């Protein structure tokens, strides 16, 4: 093999190696930023991983919103997909459109049976429902009617709120 051909071969091999490394880094970065969505039933059945960032969505159960008396930023509420209910704790300012009987998607981590949210997103008008929540409700054959607060029995005292650290 002559020198010119060897140089071309080396250049092609280094280029391919660089491309493979670049693709591997992109795949790794995308994997780290992916938040998997779980509805309340999947979370209640234990399908959601513990201490891994996920997205949870559903409707806020009427009568479930509780604020800590000594910490106005500490909020507990429950989300439902009309089959199961999951308690959520959140430390921070809720969006202005957050309300009972409305759709939310929260990003956070499961800690035991409680979803500790680091971010809560609320619907942006009365007709909007997050796509994941709408799909979950459709799969559960629900029309969008919100269950009554009698179906949710909040704990008598607030759970200890843990701040999500990312």
UniProtKB/Swiss-Prot annotation:
Q: Which family does it belong to?
A: Belongs to the CcmE/CycJ family.
Q: Name one GO biological process term.
A: cytochrome complex assembly
UniProt keyword annotation of Membrane present: yes
For whether the record's keyword set contains Metal-binding, the answer is: yes
Residue numbers on the Cytoplasmic membrane side: 1-8
Per the record, the domain of life is: Bacteria
Report membrane topology: Single-pass type II membrane protein
Segments crossing the lipid bilayer: 9-29
Q: Which amino acids does the record list as binding heme?
A: 124, 128
Q: Where is the composition biased (Polar residues)?
A: 142-152
User: Region Disordered: which residues?
Assistant: 133-166
Note one Pfam family from the annotation.
Answer: CcmE
Gene label? ccmE
Q: What does this protein do?
A: Heme chaperone required for the biogenesis of c-type cytochromes. Transiently binds heme delivered by CcmC and transfers the heme to apo-cytochromes in a process facilitated by CcmF and CcmH.
Localization recorded for this chain is: Cell inner membrane
Topological domain spans for side Periplasmic: 30-166
| Cellular component GO terms held in the UniProt record | plasma membrane
Q: Name one GO molecular function term.
A: heme binding
- Keywords for the protein's UniProt record, in alphabetical order: Cell inner membrane, Cell membrane, Cytochrome c-type biogenesis, Heme, Iron, Membrane, Metal-binding, Signal-anchor, Transmembrane, Transmembrane helix
Biased amino acid composition, Basic and acidic residues? 156-166
PANTHER family, from UniProt? CYTOCHROME C-TYPE BIOGENESIS PROTEIN CCME HOMOLOG, MITOCHONDRIAL
Which named protein is this? Answer: Cytochrome c-type biogenesis protein CcmE
């Amino acid at each position: 093999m002559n020198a010119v051909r060897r140089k071309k071969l080396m250049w092609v091999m280094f280029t391919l190696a660089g491309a493979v490394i670049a693709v591997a880094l992109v795949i790794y970065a995308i994997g780290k930023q992916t938040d998997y969505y779980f509805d309340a039933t999947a979370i209640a059945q234990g399908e959601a991983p513990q201490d891994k960032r996920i997205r949870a969505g559903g409707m806020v159960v009427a009568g479930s919103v509780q604020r800590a008396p000594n910490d106005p930023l500490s909020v507990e509420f429950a989300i439902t997909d009309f089959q199961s209910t999951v308690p959520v704790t959140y430390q921070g300012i809720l969006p202005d459109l957050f309300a009972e009987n409305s759709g939310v998607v929260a990003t956070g981590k499961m800690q035991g049976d409680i979803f500790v949210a680091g971010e809560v997103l609320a619907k942006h008008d009365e007709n909007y429902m997050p796509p994941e929540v709408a799909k979950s409700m459709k799969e559960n054959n629900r029309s969008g009617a919100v269950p009554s607060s009698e179906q949710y029995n909040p704990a008598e005292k607030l759970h200890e709120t843990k701040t999500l650290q990312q």
